[in-house]
Amino acid sequence: MNPNQKIITIGSICMVVGIISLILQIGNIISIWVSHSIQTGNQNHPETCNQSIITYENNTWVNQTYVNISNTNVVAGQDATSVILTGNSSLCPISGWAIYSKDNGIRIGSKGDVFVIREPFISCSHLECRTFFLTQGALLNDKHSNGTVKDRSPYRTLMSCPVGEAPSPYNSRFESVAWSASACHDGMGWLTIGISGPDNGAVAVLKYNGIITDTIKSWRNNILRTQESECACVNGSCFTIMTDGPSNGQASYKILKIEKGKVTKSIELNAPNYHYEECSCYPDTGKVMCVCRDNWHGSNRPWVSFDQNLDYQIGYICSGVFGDNPRPNDGTGSCGPVSSNGANGIKGFSFRYDNGVWIGRTKSTSSRSGFEMIWDPNGWTETDSSFSVRQDIVAITDWSGYSGSFVQHPELTGLDCMRPCFWVELIRGQPKENTIWTSGSSISFCGVNSDTVGWSWPDGAELPFSIDK
């Protein structure tokens, strides 16, 4: 082979090797692209149903211990356009209560980072339900939890997290600086109401979708306060009740109509000899019903019902099945305040069904322990103490606390009625237990017209914690 032939042969071999290498590289790129398409296709494959849920794990390490802080559900393929929650539906017919959520916050907080809280409540939009709560600016099992039995301080804030999750710095959203609060969704945005400041001049700050839209100054300079549960929205307007004045005597009560975070109308109730605090409100057939706490002289609960023009009616639940705590043993009720054991009280709720009423109450008549749901078929208007259904929620040997109502609108559930729900606060720590702190977890239930069961769903944390020893 002469030199020219050698050069041609070597060049041909190099060219063939180069072409083969190029083909292999192109094949590698195609393989990677196909593999990536298959993986992302599996994660985002559209289903035949209306929505798919993609779950992302949010994990952390605490003191070398692996803690699963939360599972965040991202709704995919669902129309997230705004709707107006009309509130025109009636309450769904129900036969009992199915457990909806339990956050186990105190149990998890013995090792994980969980907020010291009280006054939790739940509110739902047309897309999700969230737990709102008042933090103490501290974590469980930490030195700053000391003295958190105090109700009002500059460190308290309203925050929220997905319902059923323990409230932690990793899954919670700041809402407002507040030691008294309310929140609700009108279908277009979240309204939050946070009250903070000194007892003799507190101010309520209203936010709509996180932006300050209005403020309300204390008008009696005596601990302006609000619901500690969700406000109620009807046809784009949201409604709340505020109290200012003595906790053990005649105070002043106002209904406020709020649109996109701005107060558009308010009235002061003409309610002599009535006492309204910490009302639990819900929409029903275009009106709003609120069942409240009488901390002055009633062991039964006062109520106020009003329309969108704030024309209102007032009364007390007549049933001899009393709903407050402390309270006397069940007996003869009254459509006015029942004075026996009427001083002091606890936040609570009831749901009216024509002349009947579902009453939520502690099992104990004197301490904040146990919880049960009672159906009194004529208790809204009659004073006897007979009832037909009792469903156990928390045993009398376990601590309970505040309770309140919330609803799930048809725009969320797909039902043609308003689903009634309630939450129960499970208080732990001071003043009843040997700790340096006060906090709570929560459970919630929703009304169903199918099988349910009575049981006890207590907080379940073993106290004291290491910080208490």
From Swiss-Prot:
Chain sites annotated for binding substrate: 118, 152, 277-278, 293, 368
Pfam families tied to this protein: Neur
Gene that specifies this protein: NA
Species assigned in the record: Influenza A virus (strain A/Brevig Mission/1/1918 H1N1)
Region feature (Hypervariable stalk region): 36-90
Membrane topology: Single-pass type II membrane protein
Activity regulation text: Inhibited by the neuraminidase inhibitors zanamivir (Relenza) and oseltamivir (Tamiflu). These drugs interfere with the release of progeny virus from infected cells and are effective against all influenza strains. Resistance to neuraminidase inhibitors is quite rare.
Entry domain remark: Intact N-terminus is essential for virion morphogenesis. Possesses two apical sorting signals, one in the ectodomain, which is likely to be a glycan, and the other in the transmembrane domain. The transmembrane domain also plays a role in lipid raft association.
Entry keyword Glycoprotein: yes
Any one GO BP annotation for this protein: viral budding from plasma membrane
Function comment: Catalyzes the removal of terminal sialic acid residues from viral and cellular glycoconjugates. Cleaves off the terminal sialic acids on the glycosylated HA during virus budding to facilitate virus release. Additionally helps virus spread through the circulation by further removing sialic acids from the cell surface. These cleavages prevent self-aggregation and ensure the efficient spread of the progeny virus from cell to cell. Otherwise, infection would be limited to one round of replication.
Region Involved in apical transport and lipid raft association, annotated ranges: 11-33
Record topology, Intravirion segments: 1-6
Virion surface-side positions: 28-469
Root EC class: hydrolase
EC id: 3.2.1.18
Cofactor(s) the protein requires to work: Ca(2+)
Keywords: Calcium, Disulfide bond, Glycoprotein, Glycosidase, Host cell membrane, Host membrane, Hydrolase, Membrane, Metal-binding, Signal-anchor, Transmembrane, Transmembrane helix, Virion
Subcellular location: Virion membrane; Host apical cell membrane
GO MF entries: exo-alpha-sialidase activity; metal ion binding
Swiss-Prot/TrEMBL catalytic activity: Hydrolysis of alpha-(2->3)-, alpha-(2->6)-, alpha-(2->8)- glycosidic linkages of terminal sialic acid residues in oligosaccharides, glycoproteins, glycolipids, colominic acid and synthetic substrates
Family: Belongs to the glycosyl hydrolase 34 family.
Summary of subunit composition and partner proteins: Homotetramer.
InterPro entries: Glyco_hydro_34 (IPR001860), Sialidase_Influenza_A/B (IPR033654), Sialidase_sf (IPR036278)
Protein's name in the database: Neuraminidase
Gene Ontology, cellular component aspect: host cell plasma membrane; membrane; virion membrane
Domain of life where this protein originates: Viruses
Upper lineage: Viruses, Riboviria, Orthornavirae, Negarnaviricota, Polyploviricotina
Binding-site positions, Ca(2+): 294, 298, 324, 344
